[in-house]
């Protein structure tokens, strides 16, 4: 099985995770994430109005938040503690086609302060409704012996595009993405997910994150929601 957390399969993300796990930047100390998207802003096409409704389960926290926190875990380590705040900055959303309004029942801004099992602490500013030309993703990791940064500017968020890796330590260039043959940047990470699954099938292995990982991500998102709602730190135990 495979699930839709494709960002962790990006070759550049995998190289960043390798730099951390191999100790090239020393002991991971802290990280800072800024994750922005054009989506879930003050105006939306009517076909996406379901993303404003809590019952749909598809919203800024579950989509952009879920992908962002999964990348934190892919590069650093599983998250063990979470403090959070959420805000709905646009409680009334304009529907593009009709000019009418729809009530937004879900957050469009998420702030997370967390800690991973490796001991590294991190902050994540997860922001919706950013102008497309200003959208950015930045994931800065500081270690005891060095640093690395992952960046992207895809308007629909980090899960939808390629990334750039920089570091003060030398590293081999990331592998070429399997979906780099002109079929569009949004396919890069999904293509890598399928390639990983195919390798598993050929080898009789089960290394591609599946339903158990999806459950973990859902619990992570729920921990963010609970931390924001209760004002209490949440401890994650799988």
Language-model regions, residue ranges each:
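Glycine-rich phosphate/pyrophosphate-binding beta-alpha loops
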Residues: 66, 125-134
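Glycine/proline-rich active-site loop of Rossmann-fold NAD(P)-dependent oxidoreductases
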Residues: 105-106, 120, 133-136
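A general structural signal for well-ordered alpha-helical segments in protein cores
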Residues: 13, 68-69, 190-195, 221
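C-terminal lid/capping helical subdomain adjacent to the catalytic/cofactor pocket in oxidative enzymes
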Residues: 215, 229-238
């Amino acid at each position: 099985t495979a699930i839709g957390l494709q960002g962790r399969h990006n070759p550049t993300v995998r190289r960043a995770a390798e730099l951390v796990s191999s100790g090239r930047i020393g002991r991971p100390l802290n990280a800072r994430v800024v994750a922005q998207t054009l989506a879930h802003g003050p105006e939306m096409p009517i076909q996406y109005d379901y993303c404003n409704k809590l019952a749909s389960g598809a919203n800024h926290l579950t989509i952009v938040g879920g992908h962002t926190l999964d990348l934190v875990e892919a590069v650093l380590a599983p998250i063990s503690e979470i403090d959070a705040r959420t805000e709905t900055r646009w409680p009334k959303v304009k529907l593009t086609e009709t000019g009418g309004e729809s009530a937004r029942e879900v957050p469009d801004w998420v702030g997370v302060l967390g800690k991973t099992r490796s001991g590294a602490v991190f902050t994540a500013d997860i922001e919706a409704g950013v102008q497309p030309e200003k959208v950015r993703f930045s994931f800065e990791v500081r270690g005891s012996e060095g640093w690395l940064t992952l960046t992207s500017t895809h308007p629909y968020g980090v899960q939808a595009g390629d990334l750039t890796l920089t570091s003060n330590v030398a590293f081999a260039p990331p592998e070429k993405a399997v979906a780099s043959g002109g079929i569009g940047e949004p396919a890069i990470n999904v293509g890598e997910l399928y390639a990983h699954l195919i390798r598993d099938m050929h080898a009789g292995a089960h290394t591609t994150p599946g339903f158990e990982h999806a459950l973990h991500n859902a619990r992570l998102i729920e921990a963010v929601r609970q931390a924001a709602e209760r004002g209490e730190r949440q401890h994650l135990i799988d």
